[in-house]
Amino acid sequence: MRIVMKFGGALMEDAEQISNCASLVAERAKKDYEVVVSVSAMSNVTDQLVAMGESARLGDMERVRITIAEIEQRHIETAEKLCNENTLCETKENTKKLLETLNQCLTGIFLLRELTPRSKDLLLSFGERLSVGLMRGALIMKGVNAMELTGGEAGIITDSNYGNAKPLLNITEVMVKDRLLPVLKGGVVPVVTGFIGQDENAVITTLGRGGSDYTSTILASALEADEVWIWKDVNGIMTADPKIVSGARTIPTLSYAEVMEMAYFGAKVLHPLTVTPVQERRIPIRIRSAYAPKNPGTIIRETGDKAKIVKAVTSIRGLSIITTGGAGMIGVPSVVSRVFSTLAANNVSVVMISQSSSQANISMLIHNSDLEKALKALKVEFRNGDLVRDIHTIPKVAVVAIVGEGMRGTKGVAARLFNAVAEANGNVLCISQGSSELNISFAVIEEDVDKVVQSIHSAFGLDKA
């Protein structure tokens, strides 16, 4: 059996946790499983790298030196607890070489007083490049032969859209098979950096937010793995955020489509793109707890359990509604096109859309941080006032969504949903539902989110087995 295991930053916090992760790998590797491992940076290191980039750009190299020293001490001390005598020397040497290169990168940013997307990708890559050596050392200590590789060295080839690079899946499949299959056949566990690839010019790129999970499914698809196991510090995917709903439960089974909807609408589980590489090959993804490895967690596959009409309720905070209106919009398709083209040109991401049937107005939910520039751009675009006469906003709102394949063709779901919202004294500001009937999403004032989510969770019996 061939599996890809992914370990996130929360599980790479210290020597004890990394050793625990290595034990999970070793257990399978010693049973003749072919295992590929993908790891994130140690917890908080990526944030430190981001902060150092800003410090260097602003000329504060003293802060940079202090932080590099902290990172070096943490990684060396962790290596000393994880590695045997033979691998410790090598791991220490590699760590110091990487940190020297990191210092050179930051010195360049300091001298130019500029942090380009390409430079930032290089900078952010160091977290994972440092952590793979620790995992390799821990595996060797447990009697597992392992080798470390960057995503690019493993064969993940991307475009050159630095900061959010897209994998070139056809080339990647060929390269990953060529580089990793001989390693696996030789009984070696490849430990691959999550989050990182390289473009066709061998320049390091990053896959954007959620990139480490994405790496694991890219590798699984290319290698035609049997399963992907994404290890986390929770027992799978929950029916709601347990910080909001104390009775939230683990969902045993989800479909690819359901988990993509959940991820898009705020469930902090997987990036929606994570599913894409494995969906066509029908490779299951398991979300499991590294602290309770016997717990089955959640399995994501082609079809979920349709017995439950609604599987989960999710939410996204920190949003604003921006509405464009005017009689001139009626029957003029180009107006909507101009609205979205204007927002796209200003790098404003639209989370949700709701349009009146009269076509006289369209409401869009965007992130609070984008509100000012979106409002300014739309006012400039429609300054003549002949088509769009009114542009108004509602700040501090949130989207709440219910997700489930069982909603398709089931009567009365919307009625139950909005009865639950009313019972929580929530006020629905706008609504959106796609023809797939996989979700119903709506906006409420942000301060009402918790009570609305709790009421919906109870109304659909999500706290019951």
Which positions does each model-derived feature cover?
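Nucleotide/pyrophosphate-binding catalytic subdomain
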Residues: M1-L270, V275, A443-I445, K464
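Residue-level detector of flexible, active-site-proximal loop/helix-junction positions
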Residues: E153-G155, A292, S435
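Structural motif
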Residues: R2-I3, E34-V37, I76, N145-M147, ...
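Acidic/polar residues at beta-strand termini and the immediately following turn/coil
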Residues: D241, S289-Y291
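Conserved dinucleotide-binding and phosphotransfer motif residues
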Residues: K31, K142, R281, N346, ...
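Acidic/polar loop patches that form or flank catalytic/metal-binding clefts of enzymes
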Residues: H271, R282-S289
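A conserved regulatory-domain signal marking ACT and ACT-like small-molecule sensing domains
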Residues: K294-A465
